UniProtKB/Swiss-Prot annotation:
The record marks 41-42 as: Reactive bond for trypsin. Belongs to the venom Kunitz-type family. Expressed by the venom gland. Serine protease inhibitor. Residues 1-24 form the signal peptide. InterPro entries: Kunitz_BPTI, Kunitz_BPTI_sf, Prtase_inh_Kunz-CS, TFPI/VKTCI-like. This is Kunitz-type serine protease inhibitor kunitoxin-Tel1.
Length: 90
């Protein structure tokens, strides 16, 4: 196989690995908790992972307590719950 073919194959394998859905075993358990705005009354725009839609969605956070399924940015939610780094076998 030519070096160009090997590079194409490597690129396709990398893309496939990134697009393969994450198994629930790699996702922290708190990602499956429901959105919880907490008892306080601040109105902060936060994000939580919705396990039904497999997406990070916006909710209004009260500013205190709640649970760990609570992220200041959609990117952090996505990195943690949608596409966490995969564990590599040793």
């Amino acid at each position: 196989m030519s070096s160009g073919g090997l590079l194409l194959l490597l690129g396709l394998l990398t893309l496939w690995a990134e697009l393969t859905p994450v198994s629930g075993q790699d996702r922290p358990k708190y990602c499956d908790l429901p959105a919880d705005s907490g008892p306080c009354r601040a109105r902060k725009r936060h994000f939580y992972y919705n396990s039904r839609s497999n997406q990070c969605e916006e909710f209004t956070y009260g500013g205190c307590r709640g649970n760990e399924n609570n992220f200041e940015t959609k990117d952090k939610c996505h990195y943690t719950c949608v596409a966490p780094p995969r564990r590599r076998p040793l």
